[in-house]
Amino acid sequence: MTGYGLRVLVTAASRHGATQEIAVAIASRLTESPAGRAAGLTAVAVPVGQDADPSGFTAVVLGSAVYAGRWLESARTYAATRAGGLRQRPVWLFSSGPIGEPPFPPDEPHDVAAMLQLTGAHGHRVFPGRLEKARLGFGERAMVTAMRAPLGDFRNWTDINAWADDIAAELVGATTAPAVGRP
């Protein structure tokens, strides 16, 4: 079997757009990575709210913004509703949300262990997010002010691209490796 024809769905839940921008960057990098180009890999980024069916894809990258230590409800619902299809293909998870230097909070979201088990994912990465007051609602702005949360874009595109490169290499390697017991 060759790596040609690999299709990857990158789907994410985003409240203010930063996590969806990460999903778009991951999809783009999967396609443009050295392994992705060599194998003809294609990836698409679809907001999780569109409930994309994973069955037409070789692999899935599922992500969510994190608020109050948890994934957004739409991402949790997608994982639960699509668990059967997700478990039949390679899946990777990512979270976006910590802010500042160093990123805070440093811990993984509370529900990641359950998401890993539910989806059978190969792994999970936490990426720093973006916090801009202009994109927040009144209640969110009040909370940010009270917490003295640092404002800014803390996303590290080099780390995001490197992770996508690793996923592409793993996918291409898995589809081009000879079967066990065959010459």
Give the location of each predicted region.
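FMN-binding flavodoxin-like domain, especially the glycine-rich phosphate-binding loop
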Residues: 3-4, 21, 33-37, 59, ...
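N-terminal beta1-alpha1 ligand-phosphate binding loop
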Residues: 2-36
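Structured loop/turn residues at secondary-structure junctions
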Residues: 14, 66-67
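A short beta-strand-loop structural module common to alpha/beta enzyme folds
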Residues: 33-51
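Short, charge-patterned binding micro-sites
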Residues: 51-52, 63-64
